[in-house]
Amino acid sequence: MSETLTLSDAKSIIENQIEELAKRNKEPEWMTKIRYKALEEFMKAPLNDPVIDEETLLNFIAKPEIEGIPEKVESLDDLPPEMKDLLDRLGINEVEQKYIAGLAVQTDTGVIYNQFLQEWAKKGLIVLPTEEAVRRYPDIMKEHFLKLFKAGESKLTAYHIAIWNGGIFLYVKENLKVPFPLHLFFLIQESSLAQAPHITIIAEKNSEVHLIEGCTAPILVRHSLHLDMTEAYLHENAKVRLTVLQNWPEYVHTRPMTRAKVGRNAEFINTTVSLGAGKSNIANPKYWVGENGYVELNGVILGQKDWYIDLGGEMHLQGEGGRGINASKSVIMDESTVITRGKIVAEAKKTKGHISCDALLLSDKARMETYPGLVSLVDEAELSHEAAIGKIKEEELFYLMSRGLSEEKATQLIVKGFVEPMLKDIPIEFVVEIKKIIELAVSGGF
């Protein structure tokens, strides 16, 4: 079908998908209008993607119509085997009721499992599938939905807005501090599928929350697209941590879109651990930081095979005393390409920003590029950048091998130590799994 598909054909397919989604989700008219307006922008917007060309995009669009409401499950035991295996390895099954505030799971185009501790709901924590939040909290959603994005930015942005499906709405009431993390997992089960969850985070004054996202797919999935969009709104003194753990198989393209508006004295820490980047992974999150606000963007990147990974981050320090840090550590193997970009714009006095990029090259054919951008529009601003790209030092290997380690074990130990500082805010059960994957990758078994 994709060989003869045109943009006009794509328009008809997307129109059918919009109607199916509106019917399936019992969607209010104002949301359906947003979808149709995005479709108009899709037809004329630039693609702006170095890997996904128009033919590839049309392959995703050519997927048959969205089916009915995904069947919900009441127990973790009823989840798809791939997701259940992942949760078992992480110990989620055992700790769900005790140590985490809740868990949601989305397969393909809908949330099928959503369990959150009732005591937190009574205190003012709202966690719902996005389509349900649109119906139950229309005023809040109208105020925040797509206020940080414009459909005309690119075809992929417009496509997401037109066909978004699933995701969650996370609302934290004023003064509520959730001490345990919320977990959200995405699983792609079908090939040639575009999964487009929409996530909205609203943290009211003096609130705190930590959301952990996990992304994966069975190894046999071919040529699928994960196209998620996250909007975060942090009010005064709010603290939000967003941790994203990606482990996609090699034929999945990933295009996460994250933006956050960080209010006065608020703090947003966004950490991405990309262990399985899929065929390509391109992201350029944006943040707007208010007076004395703070944003920290951390990235741990594992490049393998012929993967193409291009991760950036743009920070606008708009309020006096605003601060931003963009830090990444990359381990690059085989013939993979990793590109890191960072841009910090100082727009107010007494702002500070720093970009750091460290990379370990484990192959002569691996490639690393870094593009820092520091822009000061005021006199009283401090902006800085540092980068270090190189191979493992022979003396480090020699020392560890002299202590009885094989070269493989020594390399694994060095690589794990290299990324360790970036994992400080991640629960230990995830850190253990991350280190296992790194060990397998370095030894050629991943």
UniProtKB/Swiss-Prot annotation:
Record InterPro entries: Fe-S_cluster_assembly_SufBD, SUF_FeS_clus_asmbl_SufB, SUF_FeS_clus_asmbl_SufBD_core, SUF_FeS_clus_asmbl_SufBD_sf
GO biological process: iron-sulfur cluster assembly
Pfam families: SUFBD_core
UniProt xrefs under NCBIfam families: sufB
Protein family: Belongs to the iron-sulfur cluster assembly SufBD family.
Full protein name: Iron-sulfur cluster assembly SufBD family protein PH1385
